[in-house]
């Protein structure tokens, strides 16, 4: 074994790249470390292309092993199962910037597997995973236009911080991940606490500048450890076929893209393509129909892009900075705790909000430690939203990613547990889609939360920006359609308030996106965001003054912490009886805080009354309504409070002489008793005759 090792300082940590020892049968394997966080990245590519595919078959699998954190998995089988949400999100984070760096026409299957084998609880594994992936692809010999760098940027006390630790991130107003090559930014993913556009853009620039040390180090690593580049050449286009397709379809395609309604437009585009294809097959039965399909797709792309660059109206007739028509409704469903219907053009989200107790919060046990998530946002994209049929079931990677982006957009304005002691689940059902459904989910979530009475700090809106760039000419598009996303050069999603940005996601497909272009996009997005917020505020401008009548109302009381065991009871018998008999949900904290949740106010009052009885202290001199629970020769034992009994001595039953207790009292008889004394051992002495005298005096 001849290991090749490259180490360099990166921010607060030392990064080490090593190859030549582990997983030597893969095309490339790199053991990448940042501090004590270590990942094994392997790359395998098939040497033969699958020409039947019309896409690049790249798979990125990211897996966290519990042994990396010195843990044994839970569950019956005691081994890792399907990918967690965090694993899915990091796999997408790695996939997005590397995919554009493979050459057009490359159809060989490539699989990247990232395995976290050691983790420092202060160093997230995502950045080193991206660096390790870039290094492995660089040395694999597979055609790849890297190296790629990656950085996390924080913002604390007005200064940017490179690759902050977990503890530092907790106090940071920004958590931004940026990836790019030496020349260009390719991907941004971020969450922020309503920061200004210039701060966000500065963070992107700072992260890209700082990660050049990674790009340079991987280039040196490749020079020492790289395998020979594959003998692959891009497929050459048949220029005669290109010209023929242009002659047959360009005019029809141009006319089809004058149709503003998506479904009608798609039908006409399909007609144009089918006619051109039929004409080509009639002329030459041996023509490669797959190549024809690809060239028709390229023609379609050129038609749309050339119109936009020429300054002509967009597909649906809008100018570059125009927003589609908005229709905003709050409170659209009768029994949900909060709901909204947000429609922007042909994109629509039906969003619901459900309130629950602390017990309903999501418990997450990852290799980075345990955490509780009180605010959950789930995004669903059913096939009918785009007029198609398809499988319905567990959420796909895209749905998980879009839900997390919307969550990031809202998280900065959510109330604390002290301000609003509820768990909150939002579900965004995309009922129509033609571009930027994740940003529609942000808008719909803001509305649904307000409708549910959740005291969010302010409204939040989201907008998706696009870009078409040819040479030095470029056009930034506001509120892009699905076609403009697919055919454009950039997908730039921004969520935020009137005061600043709360989430920013950017995916760039080309090099040459300058700081000027990003600045224009951010400023244009700000104007669009404010316009949408103004329309949203007309539907509901602030949270409702009260929660839904159908939502559980949480009432908080305090008891003596020493009394908690009395409320719980032996084996949980007391609290179980309380919840079952009152129909409430009861949660107890070690400090004596008791939270009672119920949508029925009377049930809550009854639960409070019974808890107060259980935890009440016996007061000397007070008269209680008691029940006879045991009769003995020298008196009777009376229950005066739950778990609190006292003795009425035979001499305290009546003013008259009592020879036989049973002549005056019987089991389960209700009697009034006065507390005469509580001794040091907690024994309670009661009197019936004193109680009668006190009642008579009153």
UniProtKB/Swiss-Prot annotation:
A GO molecular-function annotation: magnesium ion binding
Matching PROSITE patterns: KH_TYPE_1 (PS50084), S1 (PS50126)
Cellular compartment(s): Cytoplasm
UniProt entry tagged with the keyword DNA-binding: no
Domain annotation KH: ranges: 552-611
Keyword RNA-binding: yes
SUPFAM superfamilies: Eukaryotic type KH-domain (KH-domain type I) (SSF54791), Nucleic acid-binding proteins (SSF50249), Polynucleotide phosphorylase/guanosine pentaphosphate synthase (PNPase/GPSI), domain 3 (SSF46915), Ribonuclease PH domain 2-like (SSF55666), Ribosomal protein S5 domain 2-like (SSF54211)
Signal peptide span: none
GO cellular component: cytosol
Pfam families the UniProt entry points to: KH_1 (PF00013), PNPase (PF03726), RNase_PH (PF01138), RNase_PH_C (PF03725), S1 (PF00575)
Catalytic class of the enzyme: transferase
Matches recorded under InterPro entries: ExoRNase_PH_dom1, ExoRNase_PH_dom2, ExoRNase_PH_dom2_sf, KH_dom, KH_dom_type_1, KH_dom_type_1_sf, NA-bd_OB-fold, PNPase
Alphabetized UniProt keyword annotations: Cytoplasm, Magnesium, Metal-binding, Nucleotidyltransferase, RNA-binding, Transferase
Record-linked SMART domains: KH (SM00322), S1 (SM00316)
Domain of life: Bacteria
Swiss-Prot/TrEMBL cofactor(s): Mg(2+)
GO BP of this protein: mRNA catabolic process; RNA processing
UniProt EC number: 2.7.7.8
PANTHER family the UniProt entry points to: POLYRIBONUCLEOTIDE NUCLEOTIDYLTRANSFERASE, POLYRIBONUCLEOTIDE NUCLEOTIDYLTRANSFERASE 1, MITOCHONDRIAL
Protein family: Belongs to the polyribonucleotide nucleotidyltransferase family.
Family matches, as HAMAP family: PNPase
Assembly with partners or alone: Component of the RNA degradosome, which is a multiprotein complex involved in RNA processing and mRNA degradation.
Entry protein name: Polyribonucleotide nucleotidyltransferase
Name of the gene: pnp
